Amino acid sequence: MSNDKKIVITTRDRVLRAWQNSTELVRDFENYAKETLDDKTAAEMFQKYAVDEGRHAAELLKLLHSYQDNGAV
């Protein structure tokens, strides 16, 4: 197999994957918070993590939009 056609992973690709991971973590942490009925401390921790991860996802999405607006698609 020839190595003359390498796949290039861009920063935008990495940001997109990070955003996808982040949104998935938000859903996971929200579900964990709802499902954790036996430990209020853990449920509150999961809810806090969901909010924190939501902020990360929003920042990543903002960066993705800036890439799109500047033609880095």
Across the structure, where does each feature detected by a protein language model lie?
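Iron-associated oxidoreductase/ferritin-like identity signal
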Residues: 1-73
